[in-house]
Amino acid sequence: MLTLTQTLTDYPVSLLRAIADARGLQSLVHAATPAALAVELSAALADPGSIVDAVERLPETAQTLLAALVQAGGAMTAPSFARLAGEVRQGGPAWLAREQPWLAPINAAEVLWYQGLIGRAFATVGGETGDFIFVPVDVLAWLPSASVTTGASLQLPLAPAPGTVHLSSYRLALDAGTLLAFVQNNEVMQDPTGRWRAADLAALNQQLLAPLPEASLKGAAGATDGGDRLSLLLTLGQALGWWRTHGGRLRLLATPARSWLQAPAPDQAHALWQAWLASTEWDDLRRVPDLRCEGSGWRNDAVATRRRLLVHLATIRPGVWHRREDLVAAIRRHDPDFQRSDGIYTTWYIRRSHESTYLLGFEHWNEVEGALLRFLIAGPLHWLGALDIDASGHGETAGEHGPLDTLRVTSQGAAWLAGQPHRVNAPPPAPIRVEADFNVYVPHSAAAFDRFRVARCTQWEASQPDFRYRITQTALRRAAAGGITAGRVLAFLRAVTQGHVPANVARALENLES
């Protein structure tokens, strides 16, 4: 930002003398012209002893405000500063002479202003351009450094562990494997807007570990503004380049699909996490089920919002339960502008779905920013595996952003929040089983690529407690059309079951091969 000299250069003489009077520096400034007076006063104000003395004499509210500025890196947007401290009254020479506001400041902002400890400028700070309140750099150098970062200062109280927990684990990754097999085995049609054909969407939804209710499926899933788990899954599949569209039909791309399927489960989950972090197609704010974002004259930055918020989540100790509302309140206290870095709350046209009035102004923070945080906690952060949540009266389907009390950061979430993949020594997967009734059972812990290959030559039957597929004539004909003979199917099943293929199943496949 600016030095004291740069800050004071454009001040009128009356304001410069008011600052000198407030700091008790009248005897050190004698120049008559504004430019010369600004140079003299800035030199006096920059004296380290004078700065330390001025800070020590500040009232507690002003010291707290100055510490907040230091903690923010020495600058914050003028709207954000005004919410904390109030506005500095402005007036010409006659008003200054009459009111003498430095003798009776009405708020902490005026105290710091007339002490020459802050300035105001239109500038670019941290990539954000706007009106900023700042501490001049030659003052900032002599102020105590912030003892904690914004994120570390959340200090959430502990909460008791809930009776029932929704464990996130690798559930979305398991459903991603289901998605890939579904696209491979079916003629999935997509319209120009990216929405799937209703019948395809319903068939895929049926196979998921957490299928959506029919009403939610018709209203949201697959749409560009759908705020449900299935919509996120489809968005991430597109972002990871798993398919292309040809003549309206989705066709799996072998290289990216195989690469993901053959990765270890922790790496698969991490790839989905990274795709969400970088996604501009998935705008979390516009996916909040109860909010409607309207108008084209404003734009939010979903990627920047995620990254700023995750800095705070990274300071939470994994495995410890906290109340959701305590986290929301802590973000409001310490970083309310996490998605509106300019601090302006009057330019985004957002309303609740059942109301016509727009939520303009900081007084609606809880209805917009708070709603976004609650959606992220119960939605993407949980679906992707970064948070476990309280399952009491709570589901994983389209309306699942309703009441929940507590959350905890998972071990893999802690690694991701630190910018690292999650390294874990997973136990060996349970074996795939083929039964005499031609059912094939694939445990959730099985390798994703093995399950994908099972799905290519079978018919899906169930996804819980294990994945269950059935060897059928229709499925074998589909596999044969893709170049997979019955002999290859038998060889594969023997390999993944350690040779335990029932004799009748083996004979049936051998007969088809001959």
Predicted regions located by residue number:
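Long, low-complexity, charged/polar intrinsically disordered regions in eukaryotic proteins
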Residues: 1-57, 121, 125-168, 248-315
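Extended alpha-helical interface modules used as scaffolds for assembling large macromolecular complexes
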Residues: 156-158, 163-183, 265-514
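P-loop NTPase catalytic cores that bind/hydrolyze ATP
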Residues: 115, 206-254, 303-310, 371-379, ...
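Hydrophobic, conserved cores of late-appearing folded domains
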Residues: 154-225, 229-234, 239-242, 247-249
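Elongated alpha-helical scaffolds
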Residues: 59-68, 73-76, 90-91, 102-120, ...
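Short acidic, hydrophobic short linear motifs in intrinsically disordered regions
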Residues: 62-65, 72-97, 184-222, 318-366
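A short, conserved structural fragment
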Residues: 9, 21-29, 92-93, 104-126, ...
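Short amphipathic alpha-helical elements of helix-turn-helix/winged-helix folds
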Residues: 7, 19, 68-72, 182, ...
